[in-house]
Regions:
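Conserved beta-strand hairpin/beta-sheet module of binuclear metal-dependent hydrolase folds
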Residues: 18-63, 172-186
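Divalent-metal (often Zn2+) His-rich catalytic cores of metallo-beta-lactamase-fold enzymes
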Residues: 175, 203-263, 267
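Active-site environment of divalent metal-dependent phosphoester hydrolases
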Residues: 55, 80-85, 106-110, 168-171, ...
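Divalent metal-coordination and catalytic microenvironments
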Residues: 24, 39, 49, 64, ...
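Active-site HxH/HxHxD metal-binding segment of metal-dependent hydrolases
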Residues: 62-150, 169
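Core dinuclear metal-dependent hydrolase active-site scaffold
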Residues: 144-176
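C-terminal regulatory/interaction regions
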Residues: 256-320
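Active-site neighborhood of phospho(di)ester-bond hydrolases with catalytic His/Asp-centered motifs
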Residues: 48-50, 73-81, 100-103, 163, ...
Length: 320
């Protein structure tokens, strides 16, 4: 292989930021690593995405405890990926009663959760360096919904919304309508490359339109710094939209020209690297993103299951 697989060469510890967006909303970010959102209500706390392991989740909990002693009653899984959900067990000791996800996310956990767990542990050795702290099995939602669910944390309204397919078929955002703060999960990234190995390229732009229609004043992306002004939110949405569209257009052009996946990948890398090559995990994501986009454009409307074995086979084929 001409370059290290996925994020196996990414061993540098990232600097954590704990950003206050309002009296009720915080963002746990770490220089492009997966983010966690925190919503503090009158009587309970909701955590959005758990971190990759209970050891990593413990740092989130430590920072929450610096600002509130209220029980962490709710954990929301914005989607099914292991790097987002396998820290969930750490929150049980902090009062967690409900693990919430869309029913579409539950379907994905049932269908491909085990394969994704093995795959992501191989892709992200730094994030999973304490993988022994993850209990056996998977993180299972205990409460699911379709379309929309409203939680009342005392007087604070929290809307959990499915605004369309994009990063996965089960993506959920959390919306504080009283404060116009949105937690997007991996539907939006900022200065970080969208992972699109399980994506719906044709649908993702319309889902971003639905996010924009809410007119968030602040937004916590899946990766990257919290966006704390409407201008920053617009930039985050625009960057994500541009990347998804550019990959899609490059792949469609290659397929129309009769090129195979390997040639399409090389063309797409050449086309996108000048614009996005400085984004976090660009080199990691692109083989997966182009492969999925090629699948969608040619013969697979729904994403195929990634396994640890398929990961390595694909990487060797595209990066040799």
């Amino acid at each position: 292989m001409s370059k290290a697989f996925a994020s196996q060469a990414d061993l540098d510890v990232k600097q954590v930021s704990f950003t206050k967006l309002s009296d009720n909303a915080y963002a746990y970010t770490a220089e492009g690593d997966p983010n966690t959102g925190i919503i503090i209500g009158d009587d309970a706390v909701l955590v959005l995405d758990t971190q990759a392991t209970p050891v990593m989740a413990a740092d989130v909990i430590r920072r929450i405890r610096e600002v509130t002693d209220k029980p962490i009653k709710y954990v929301l899984l914005t989607h099914y990926h292991a790097v987002r959900v396998l820290g969930a067990s750490a929150y049980k000791a902090e009062g967690c009663e409900y693990i919430i996800a869309s029913h579409d996310t539950l379907d994905l956990i049932r269908e491909r959760g085990e394969q994704d767990k093995a795959s992501e542990i191989g892709r992200f050795p730094r994030l999973f360096q304490n993988v022994e702290s993850v209990p056996p099995g998977l993180t299972w939602p205990t409460l699911t919904f379709t379309g929309k669910m409203t939680l009342w944390l005392g007087k604070l309204e929290v809307q959990l919304l499915q605004l369309g397919r994009g990063h996965t078929k089960g993506d959920t955002v959390a919306w504080l309508p009283q404060q116009k703060i949105l937690f997007s999960g991996d539907l939006v990234e900022f200065d970080a490359t969208p992972y699109a190995g399980d994506a719906y390229f044709k649908d993702w732009p319309a889902t971003l339109d639905n996010i924009a229609a809410l007119q968030p004043a602040q937004l916590v992306p899946g990766r990257g710094a919290a966006l704390t002004t409407p201008e920053a939110v617009a930039a985050g949405l625009a960057g994500t939209r541009s990347f998804i569209a550019d990959v899609h257009e490059a792949v469609k052009a290659g397929v129309a020209a009769g090129k195979d996946l390997n040639a399409v990948y090389k063309d797409t890398m050449a086309r996108l690297t000048p614009k996005y090559g400085h984004w976090v995990i660009f080199q990691h994501c692109m083989p997966f993103d182009v492969t999925r986009c090629f699948d969608e454009v040619t013969q697979y409307p729904d994403p195929r299951i990634w396994t640890a074995e398929r990961d390595v086979q694909m990487w060797k084929a595209l990066e040799q």
